Amino acid sequence: MAHSLYITGTEGSSGKTVVTLGLMHFLQSQVRKVAFFRPIIDSEDEARRDSSINLILKHFELDMLYRDTYACTYKEALELVTSGNMSLLIEKIFQKYKALENEYDFVLCQGTDFRDKDTA
């Protein structure tokens, strides 16, 4: 069995969270320690917490801190990319993922959609 899976969609609102719920349910019946990870979230603002992270942490009662479930915000990622530091962004995401991989038996990753973001 693999030790991680990355769920992504071809567009926003494609059902990633529903797939994530089903996979997390299955994984918890098969694997002792499962982590949830999103590489990039919209905001770190307490009032605007990521709804997928909140849902997964609460529904499956994961023993994880919220701050351990993501690598950076959209704003941080955009700043790194526009300043020519894409490699730093990739390194930051990879380091956060590897920390989870070292602590958990399986890491379920859910991609991010930026349907409401200006990507031009």
Residue ranges and their predicted role:
Residues M1-H3, D105:
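Generic structural motif recognizing short loop/turn segments at the entrances and edges of beta-strands
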Residues H3-S14, V18-A99:
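N-terminal phosphate/diphosphate-binding loop that engages ATP/GTP or pyrophosphate donors
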Residues L88-A120:
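Phosphate/Mg2+-binding loops and adjacent switch elements
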